[in-house]
């Protein structure tokens, strides 16, 4: 009976009920012969739960290969060189041996099979009985890559990509349809487990008859080609002999049997391996984009109404519904949202009714992107668990089947689509940070998020915004498709080809750029959080100071009688509540700044309604203005500086609201674990130094835990519609 599914929802499987491991007929008899149901079932549940599973799998110490259950997170873990051991299922040994034996038997019987007795591609009309020599020549002529003088020339694939390719190729060959010895697969696994990585060329594959050229260099190490090189555990280049010694492979180099060279090179493993790594990161970045959009709402004092479930339920798209629900969860109970609600109650008719698109439509923007990432992820997981060489050996029917599973179109299409997604996420981040640094839009934060005392000598995130524009422009360029640039190749035999690896490489570039953007934006959001904290303390100090000065100066007349100006205090406090503190904080008593102008305006307005009392020195409010302002000038700058000093020392009276928010784990990670601090022009440290800390942490997978911690108590459903 056929095995349906693999735990990843890929719907891959193989039958093993016939003794030789190849129950091909059974593949067509199960209840989902077209695999559509399996593909649909793979998308059940939330995207966040899927990312949680990926993160858990990524940390497991062992990856056990049996041919049909490999996940992109396992590929990413092995590729990253983590302490992960690769094991091969002993159950696969029998079916792998059966297909290998079939090739040798058919060769002995004189059966004519492509790549076993024939030439390759457009020259398959040629025939030979020297099956081993044919495989050796295959590897030789495919070693057509260019490496330059060394790694500094940038013409080699990253070792992580090669490790991913090795893992995927072993997995696909374990299904027993390829005619290769189990011992060769064990040797590749030994190279992986001992961190010995063949050097592959960066370019030279069209991912049509598989990734022929790069995969031939893995085969070159296994057969001991003199031009083959590997990177040892210590990072040095070694030849094939030393590679075998370091990997503990005994018995010497392999003498290829018929079909074995073709089995190694005629597959999509390099493209699908890199695609797996790319999608592992893309899935995490998608969740990050949802969470930081919610943090953006917090620091912008946005209106959380945009996450209301009814809005998104009526749109029907699951990605949008989930994105909104995640943001709703972050914002529900947020201390920032409670404060923002009070602010919005002040003069509501004088403020915009709704937020700009970068905030208000972020679920609608991100939702379809998440759906595409999920679809691409499942497509690649099907690919890395597929049999993708040619011909396929069907032992049960005693035949070699000539087809084209080596065509890497699922990779090219998935990577083109993923790159569009990454560009769109980057565009949203750029729109959000552009609002955040602009004091015309950011609801009272200082221009450029400048954190210092003197805005004329502190330009904050101005350089960062320029860098973000650069990143975003390059990212949008990379969004252009690769797969429409096909060239007919190999004497017009490979006249359509997927360009899967090229597309995956471009998508890997896009991931790196989006991580640069994410790192920059995350530090900017933390800066905004701290500025809101400073703002709240400054405003409290200003209100207290103005109130105290008003009581001292405006309450009593010269002879101790109650003065009409005592009624001004309430309106003076309203001015402070309505005025952005950073509009005057660098010089709070400046006559050119709005605070002093509007405080004076309050006194003038009260004086104008004071009537005949203004004619008397003892009851004139006008006569109090100078005394009030002089007292304020003597007191307020000291109080403002005191708040600044307390902020620098971490001793402010009002604590930082972020500690009461579900977004706190990300803030804490940046500020405390990474030590990326509050930026000001008064410090020597540059913005890029702090951005780099976050970028390095992302590359080291350290952001995953604090990101998921922000959503640890989400139950996977939107809040009820009440």
From Swiss-Prot:
Post-translational modifications: Contains an active site 4-methylidene-imidazol-5-one (MIO), which is formed autocatalytically by cyclization and dehydration of residues Ser-Ser-Gly.
Pathway where this protein functions: Phenylpropanoid metabolism; trans-cinnamate biosynthesis; trans-cinnamate from L-phenylalanine: step 1/1
Keyword Cytoplasm: yes
SUPFAM superfamilies per record: L-aspartase-like
PROSITE patterns per UniProt: PAL_HISTIDASE (PS00488)
GO BP of this protein: cinnamic acid biosynthetic process; L-phenylalanine catabolic process; lignin biosynthetic process; protein homotetramerization; response to water deprivation; salicylic acid biosynthetic process
Positions bearing the 5-imidazolinone (Ser-Gly) cross-link: 208-210
Residues at which (E)-cinnamate binds: 266, 354, 360, 390, 462, 490, 493
Activity regulation (record text): Inhibited by zinc ions Zn(2+), but slightly promoted by magnesium Mg(2+) and calcium Ca(2+) ions. Keeps approximately 82 percent and 37 percent of enzymatic activity after 240 minutes of treatment at 60 and 70 degrees Celsius, respectively. Repressed deamination activity by beta-mercaptoethanol.
Chief place where the protein resides: cytoplasm
Protein name as it appears in the record: Phenylalanine/tyrosine ammonia-lyase 1
Gene: PAL1
């Amino acid at each position: 009976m056929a095995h349906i599914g693999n735990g990843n929802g890929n719907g891959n499987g193989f039958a093993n009920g016939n003794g030789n491991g190849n129950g091909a007929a059974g593949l067509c008899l199960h209840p989902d012969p077209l695999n559509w149901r399996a593909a649909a079932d793979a998308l059940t549940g939330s995207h966040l739960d899927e990312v949680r599973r990926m993160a858990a799998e990524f940390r497991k110490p062992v990856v056990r290969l049996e041919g049909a259950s490999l996940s992109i997170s396992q590929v990413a873990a092995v590729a990253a060189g983590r302490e992960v051991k690769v094991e091969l299922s002993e159950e696969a040994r029998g079916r792998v041996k059966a297909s290998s034996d079939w090739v040798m038997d058919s060769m002995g019987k004189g059966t004519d099979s492509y790549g076993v007795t024939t030439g390759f591609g457009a020259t398959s009309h040629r025939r030979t009985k020297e099956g081993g020599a044919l495989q050796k020549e295959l590897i030789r002529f495919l070693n057509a890559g260019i490496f330059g003088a060394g790694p500094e020339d940038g013409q080699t694939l990253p070792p992580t990509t090669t490790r991913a390719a090795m893992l995927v190729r072993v997995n696909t060959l374990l299904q027993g349809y390829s005619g290769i010895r189990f011992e060769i697969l064990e040797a590749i696994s030994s190279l992986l487990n001992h961190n010995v990585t063949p050097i592959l060329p960066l370019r030279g594959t069209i991912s049509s008859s598989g990734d022929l050229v790069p995969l031939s260099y893995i085969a070159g190490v296994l057969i001991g080609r003199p031009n083959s090189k590997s990177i040892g555990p210590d990072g040095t280049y070694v030849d094939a002999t030393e590679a075998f010694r370091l990997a503990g492979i005994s018995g010497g180099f392999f003498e290829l049997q018929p079909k074995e060279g073709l089995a190694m090179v005629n597959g999509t493993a390099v493209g699908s391996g890199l695609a797996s790594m790319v999608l592992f990161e893309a899935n995490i970045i998608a969740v990050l984009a949802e969470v930081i959009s919610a943090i953006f709402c917090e620091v912008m004092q946005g209106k959380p109404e945009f996450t209301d479930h009814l809005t998104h339920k009526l749109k029907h798209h699951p990605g949008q519904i989930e994105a909104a629900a995640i943001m709703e969860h972050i914002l529900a109970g947020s201390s920032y949202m409670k404060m923002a609600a009070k602010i919005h109650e002040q003069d509501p008719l004088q403020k915009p009714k709704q937020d700009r698109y970068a905030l208000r439509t972020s679920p609608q923007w991100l939702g379809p992107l998440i759906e595409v990432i999920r679809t691409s992820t499942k497509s690649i997981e099907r690919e890395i668990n597929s049999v993708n060489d040619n011909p396929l050996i069907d032992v049960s029917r005693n035949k070699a089947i000539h087809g084209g599973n080596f065509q890497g179109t699922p990779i090219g299409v998935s990577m083109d689509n993923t790159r569009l997604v990454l560009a769109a996420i980057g565009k949203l981040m750029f729109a959000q940070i552009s609002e955040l640094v602009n004091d015309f839009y950011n609801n009272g934060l200082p221009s450029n998020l400048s954190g210092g005392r003197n805005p004329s000598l502190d330009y904050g995130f101005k350089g960062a915004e320029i860098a973000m524009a650069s990143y975003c422009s390059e990212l949008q360029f990379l969004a252009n498709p690769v797969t429409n640039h096909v060239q007919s190749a190999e004497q017009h035999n490979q006249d359509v080809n997927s360009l899967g690896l090229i597309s995956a490489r471009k998508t890997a570039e896009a991931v790196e750029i989006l991580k640069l953007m994410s790192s920059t934006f995350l530090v900017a959001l933390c800066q905004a959080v701290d500025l809101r904290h400073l703002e709240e303390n400054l405003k409290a100090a200003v209100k207290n100071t103005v109130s105290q000065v008003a009581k001292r100066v405006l309450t009593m007349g010269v002879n101790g009688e109650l003065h009409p100006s005592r009624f001004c205090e309430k309106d003076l406090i309203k001015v402070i509540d309505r005025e952005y503190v950073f509009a005057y904080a660098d010089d709070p008593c400046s006559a050119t700044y709005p605070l002093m102008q509007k405080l004076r305006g309050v006194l003038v307005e009260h004086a104008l309604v004071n009537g005949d009392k203004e004619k008397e020195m003892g009851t004139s409010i006008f006569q109090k203005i100078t005394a009030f302002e002089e007292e304020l000038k003597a007191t307020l700058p000291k109080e403002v500086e005191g708040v600044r000093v307390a902020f620098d020392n971490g001793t402010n009276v009002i604590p930082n609201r972020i500690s009461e928010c579900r977004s706190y784990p990300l803030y804490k990670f940046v500020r405390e674990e990474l030590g990326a601090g509050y930026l000001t022009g008064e410090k020597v440290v540059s913005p890029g130094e702090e951005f780099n800390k976050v970028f390095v942490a992302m590359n080291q997978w350290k952001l995953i835990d604090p990101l998921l911690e922000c959503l640890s108590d989400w139950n996977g459903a939107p809040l009820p519609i009440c």
